[in-house]
Amino acid sequence: MLEKYIDEVARTTGNTFMTENKVPPHLTVAAIEARSVKELRQPFLDMAKGLKAGSISLVSTGQLLPYVFYVTPVLNEYLTELSNKVYCAFKDLPDAEISKYYRPGNWLPHVTIGKKLSEEQMKQAFEVMYKRFQPLEAEIVEIGLSKVNPHEDGLIDNV
């Protein structure tokens, strides 16, 4: 269903950033700036071993102005624990910095369905999702470590 929302926003707005860059539906748990991706590999693998799948309820849409349109889950116990585990896995790395917007207790979980939208495209995305969006239950079954802009999957592990 999330892929359909991404496709619908792209089709309606003409903004194909998400589809052209093959950005899959995902919930970003942390944004880490690191000197080298290699230093993130082992902490990621160690952390991923202890994770389990979990359920989320995607209940609303929103905007991170000026460019991002998203659907958002209820922040439940599973997501809170996931955020804490990811933060703890990377917080002490000397050459890595976790964004202040993705730390436990200071995080807006969301699934981006439109990115790099103009003001007019944002309005179009809102209009189409106002008509189409239906709350849904989803299962978190994988965790990945990816580069962004453009999107590039690095490591993916089942949870």
Residue ranges: model-predicted function:
Residues 1-55, 78-137, 152-159:
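Basic, often amphipathic N-terminal segments
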Residues 29, 70-71, 113, 145:
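Short hydrophobic/aromatic-rich beta-strand segments that constitute the beta-sheet cores
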Residues 33, 62, 67, 75, ...:
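Short, flexible active-site-adjacent loop segments at beta-strand->alpha-helix junctions, enriched
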Residues 49, 53-65, 69-74:
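Hydrophobic, well-structured mid-protein blocks that either form specific transmembrane helices
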Residues 61-65, 140-154:
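Glycine-rich beta-strand-turn "strand-cap" elements at beta-sheet edges
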